[in-house]
């Protein structure tokens, strides 16, 4: 059972302490757990626990809380028990907490925390246990209470629940469950199992035959079969997160509630099943399109919180786009490297004069040419599901200039029937993806809503893909005109910023952004801006060079600091710190994330200062690069446009040398800040020790 996780050493009576809220408790608890060698870093543990609490409270009623974490900072599995005096935990029943079980499991170990929560949930659903456990005052009292009620629980386990717990299909296909259920919460831990136990206890108390599936961090357990779904009076989905609804399509009386409601009022939930207040999910049409419309929920196909979803949709589109950028960009970089002998005389044909180089450049160009359509398609997909893919991709192709309508930017003359030679680029992709999503929602909610039932089956395979995409493309064809001018303006802006007197400022901004959150939205925005500059100018740019070189600084600074002064890091961190040489040289900024998470203040300062210096030097040296990724492996594609350096070969050679200089200087500055901070900390501790001994 779960008792081996409990120990007298980790039982704390803190009734004399006063905590204004759960955050103040967690801070002190993490400090004690670090002293007990349960965790490595109290700040990381505190962050993990606070993030879990932000999803849904772990105050489970009966004046108990089960905060938990699975983190690399946990050294060994543990359950620490804290007896406290009425801590406000924002619990499900709005009652203050008197007893706290704080659970920690290492990142790479099993699911002991799940077993504890599952077993403890069963005990908590016994009213007498729930009433007694908050009042225990000692470790032995807790163990004795658990022992007595575990024996009771085993002795009273009903046969009907054993049958319900079987995953195989019933032998008698006419035998019905009173209800079947699925439970799932954002973390897949406490509330998932609490809801399961609450529903099963309710069934036992009322002599009902049930089966409950859990979708937790250990995967799907006790999975419902098609036979189970066909032989039940109702289906309860007690879920706080999105799950795959496909297998429930065509089944009636589906009741959707939160895990909290299932835990607190299972009677009310069951009454909904009895009164047949559940709904019919989807339909059981044989059309494959109807059967595969999973995750396109009512909320998704509506304008509810649409403005809040736009930001996440754009980031989602960027994440789908990046593999095309990296693949295409690196192949183009390889083409330039193969064709390096022709760098001095190939002119605009550089990278394609050699047949093999031309093969790589053409293939890379195919991938690179898809980044705008992919971005648009997956922005629409993130907002409305797969119905947004087709119109999103089409408007993305129009944005990329793959359709009719050519504009003379200077005169403003429009030729509607000529193949386009201009594009709206990323502006068109973002606006087009949003437009496609909006029109899909309008069609689903307001136009095709009242179609006869006989036509509903072909709505999603004919009306929306055909007519909807035609309308979207026609509207965007016209709307795209101002977006083309906007993209042209960006191109001109980038050309201005590449000038010697402004390039350092551009490098400074991009350098700071690249090193701010290391793979987060600010970092991605800076990187995408660099990619946009390549797409807009069709040549190497200062923006792209600044993004790549600055993004290499954080991991390199860490590696250099570890090499010069090992004491800057814990012994177990040193291998990862040395590995940052490879990470940094490969332009993988995320290699620095574990170190930033552990020492956020000093590491962020070192990263930002190092990145800013690198960006300024990149701009001052007028460095440009044609590849969007690759780190040191694409340095041969660097050039400098400094005055006085003429000729392609000399520009490349000087560009590589100046880039190495900028990278080395900024990385050593970053490392120096880390080392300096460590020396100050050691000096401060030494001084305190001397004063104490004195």
Curated annotation (Swiss-Prot):
<keyword id="KW-0597">Phosphoprotein</keyword>
<dbReference type="InterPro" id="IPR002178">
    <property type="entry name" value="PTS_EIIA_type-2_dom"/>
</dbReference>
<feature type="domain" description="PTS EIIC type-2">
    <location>
        <begin position="310"/>
        <end position="687"/>
    </location>
</feature>
<feature type="transmembrane region" description="Helical">
    <location>
        <begin position="364"/>
        <end position="384"/>
    </location>
</feature>
<feature type="transmembrane region" description="Helical">
    <location>
        <begin position="422"/>
        <end position="442"/>
    </location>
</feature>
<dbReference type="InterPro" id="IPR003352">
    <property type="entry name" value="PTS_EIIC"/>
</dbReference>
<dbReference type="InterPro" id="IPR013014">
    <property type="entry name" value="PTS_EIIC_2"/>
</dbReference>
<keyword id="KW-0762">Sugar transport</keyword>
<keyword id="KW-1133">Transmembrane helix</keyword>
<feature type="active site" description="Phosphocysteine intermediate; for EIIB activity">
    <location>
        <position position="185"/>
    </location>
</feature>
<dbReference type="GO" id="GO:0022877">
    <property type="term" value="F:protein-N(PI)-phosphohistidine-fructose phosphotransferase system transporter activity"/>
</dbReference>
<keyword id="KW-0472">Membrane</keyword>
<feature type="transmembrane region" description="Helical">
    <location>
        <begin position="542"/>
        <end position="562"/>
    </location>
</feature>
<dbReference type="GO" id="GO:0009401">
    <property type="term" value="P:phosphoenolpyruvate-dependent sugar phosphotransferase system"/>
</dbReference>
<keyword id="KW-0813">Transport</keyword>
<feature type="transmembrane region" description="Helical">
    <location>
        <begin position="390"/>
        <end position="410"/>
    </location>
</feature>
<dbReference type="Pfam" id="PF02302">
    <property type="entry name" value="PTS_IIB"/>
</dbReference>
<keyword id="KW-0598">Phosphotransferase system</keyword>
<keyword id="KW-0418">Kinase</keyword>
<dbReference type="GO" id="GO:0090563">
    <property type="term" value="F:protein-phosphocysteine-sugar phosphotransferase activity"/>
</dbReference>
<feature type="domain" description="PTS EIIA type-2">
    <location>
        <begin position="4"/>
        <end position="149"/>
    </location>
</feature>
<feature type="modified residue" description="Phosphohistidine; by HPr">
    <location>
        <position position="68"/>
    </location>
</feature>
<keyword id="KW-0808">Transferase</keyword>
<feature type="transmembrane region" description="Helical">
    <location>
        <begin position="576"/>
        <end position="596"/>
    </location>
</feature>
<keyword id="KW-1003">Cell membrane</keyword>
<keyword id="KW-0812">Transmembrane</keyword>
<dbReference type="InterPro" id="IPR003501">
    <property type="entry name" value="PTS_EIIB_2/3"/>
</dbReference>
<feature type="transmembrane region" description="Helical">
    <location>
        <begin position="502"/>
        <end position="522"/>
    </location>
</feature>
<dbReference type="Pfam" id="PF02378">
    <property type="entry name" value="PTS_EIIC"/>
</dbReference>
<comment type="function">
    <text>The phosphoenolpyruvate-dependent sugar phosphotransferase system (sugar PTS), a major carbohydrate active transport system, catalyzes the phosphorylation of incoming sugar substrates concomitantly with their translocation across the cell membrane. This system is involved in fructose transport.</text>
</comment>
<dbReference type="GO" id="GO:0005351">
    <property type="term" value="F:carbohydrate:proton symporter activity"/>
</dbReference>
<dbReference type="GO" id="GO:0016301">
    <property type="term" value="F:kinase activity"/>
</dbReference>
<dbReference type="InterPro" id="IPR004715">
    <property type="entry name" value="PTS_IIA_fruc"/>
</dbReference>
<dbReference type="InterPro" id="IPR003353">
    <property type="entry name" value="PTS_IIB_fruc"/>
</dbReference>
<dbReference type="InterPro" id="IPR016152">
    <property type="entry name" value="PTrfase/Anion_transptr"/>
</dbReference>
<dbReference type="GO" id="GO:0005886">
    <property type="term" value="C:plasma membrane"/>
</dbReference>
<dbReference type="InterPro" id="IPR050864">
    <property type="entry name" value="Bacterial_PTS_Sugar_Transport"/>
</dbReference>
<feature type="active site" description="Tele-phosphohistidine intermediate; for EIIA activity">
    <location>
        <position position="68"/>
    </location>
</feature>
<dbReference type="InterPro" id="IPR013011">
    <property type="entry name" value="PTS_EIIB_2"/>
</dbReference>
<feature type="transmembrane region" description="Helical">
    <location>
        <begin position="318"/>
        <end position="338"/>
    </location>
</feature>
<feature type="transmembrane region" description="Helical">
    <location>
        <begin position="461"/>
        <end position="481"/>
    </location>
</feature>
<protein>
    <recommendedName>
        <fullName>PTS system fructose-specific EIIABC component</fullName>
        <ecNumber>2.7.1.202</ecNumber>
    </recommendedName>
</protein>
């Amino acid at each position: 059972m779960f008792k081996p996780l409990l120990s007298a050493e980790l039982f704390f009576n803190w009734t004399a302490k006063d905590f204004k809220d759960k955050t103040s408790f967690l801070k002190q608890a993490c400090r004690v757990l670090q002293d007990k060698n349960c965790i490595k870093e109290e700040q990381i543990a505190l962050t993990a626990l606070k993030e879990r609490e932000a999803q849904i409270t772990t105050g489970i009623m009966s004046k108990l809380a089960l905060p938990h974490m699975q983190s690399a900072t946990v050294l060994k599995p543990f359950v620490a028990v804290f007896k406290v005096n009425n801590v406000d935990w924002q619990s499900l029943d709005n009652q203050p907490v008197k007893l706290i079980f704080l659970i920690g499991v290492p990142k790479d170990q099993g699911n002991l925390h799940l077993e504890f929560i599952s077993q403890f949930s069963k005990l908590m659903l016994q009213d007498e246990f729930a009433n007694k456990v908050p009042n225990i005052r000692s470790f032995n009292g807790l163990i004795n209470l658990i022992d007595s009620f575990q024996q009771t629980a085993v002795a009273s386990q009903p046969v009907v629940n054993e049958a319900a717990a079987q995953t195989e299909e019933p032998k008698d296909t006419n035998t019905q469950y009173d209800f079947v259920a699925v439970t799932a919460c954002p973390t897949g831990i406490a509330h998932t199992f609490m809801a399961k136990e609450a529903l099963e206890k309710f069934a036992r108390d009322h002599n009902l035959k049930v089966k409950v599936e859990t979708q937790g961090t250990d995967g799907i357990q006790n999975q419902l079969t098609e036979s189970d779904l066909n032989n039940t009076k109702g289906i309860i989905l007690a879920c706080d997160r999105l799950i795959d609804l496909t297998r429930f399509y065509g089944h009636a009386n589906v009741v959707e509630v939160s895990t909290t409601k299932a835990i607190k009022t299972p009677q009310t939930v069951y009454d909904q099943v009895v009164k047949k207040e559940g709904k019919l999910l989807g339909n059981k049409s044989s059309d494959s399109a109807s059967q595969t419309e999973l995750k396109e929920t009512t909320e998704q196909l509506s304008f509810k919180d649409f403005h809040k979803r736009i930001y996440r949709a754009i980031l989602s589109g960027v994440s789908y786009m990046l593999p095309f950028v990296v693949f295409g960009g690196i192949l183009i970089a390889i083409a330039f490297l193969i064709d390096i002998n022709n760098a001095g005389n190939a002119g605009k044909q550089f990278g394609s004069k050699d047949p093999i180089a031309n093969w790589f450049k053409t293939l890379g160009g195919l991938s690179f040419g898809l980044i705008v359509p992919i971005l648009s398609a997956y922005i629409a997909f993130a907002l409305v599901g797969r119905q947004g893919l087709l119109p999103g991709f089409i408007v993305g192709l129009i944005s990329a200039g793959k359709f009719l309508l050519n504009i003379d930017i200077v005169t403003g003359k429009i030729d509607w029937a000529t193949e386009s030679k201009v594009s709206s680029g990323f502006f068109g992709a973002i606006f087009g993806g949003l437009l496609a999503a909006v029109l899909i929602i309008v069609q689903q909610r307001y136009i095709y809503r009242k179609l006869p039932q006989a036509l509903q089956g072909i709505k999603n395979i004919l009306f929306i893909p055909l007519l909807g995409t035609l309308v979207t493309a026609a509207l965007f064809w016209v709307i795209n005109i101002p977006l083309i001018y906007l993209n042209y303006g960006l191109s001109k802006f980038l050309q201005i910023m590449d000038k010697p007197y402004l390039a350092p400022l551009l490098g400074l901004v991009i350098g700071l952004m690249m090193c701010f959150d290391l793979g987060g939205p600010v970092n991605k925005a800076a990187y995408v801006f660099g990619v946009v500059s390549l797409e807009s100018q069709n040549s190497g740019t200062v923006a792209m060079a600044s993004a790549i070189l600055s993004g290499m600084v954080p991991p390199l600074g860490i590696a250099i600091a570890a090499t010069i002064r090992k004491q800057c890091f814990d012994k177990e961190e040193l291998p990862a710190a040395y590995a940052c040489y490879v990470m940094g040289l490969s332009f993988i900024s995320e290699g620095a994330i574990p170190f930033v998470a552990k020492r956020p203040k000093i590491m962020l300062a070192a990263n930002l200062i190092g990145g800013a210096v690198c960006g300024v030097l990149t701009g001052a040296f007028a460095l440009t690069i044609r590849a969007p990724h690759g780190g040191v492996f694409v340095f041969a594609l660097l050039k400098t446009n400094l005055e006085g350096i003429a000729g392609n070969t000399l520009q490349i050679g000087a560009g590589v040398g100046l880039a190495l200089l900028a990278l080395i200087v900024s990385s050593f500055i970053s490392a120096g800040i880390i080392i300096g901070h460590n020396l100050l900390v050691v000096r401060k501790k030494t001084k305190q020790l001397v004063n104490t001994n004195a």
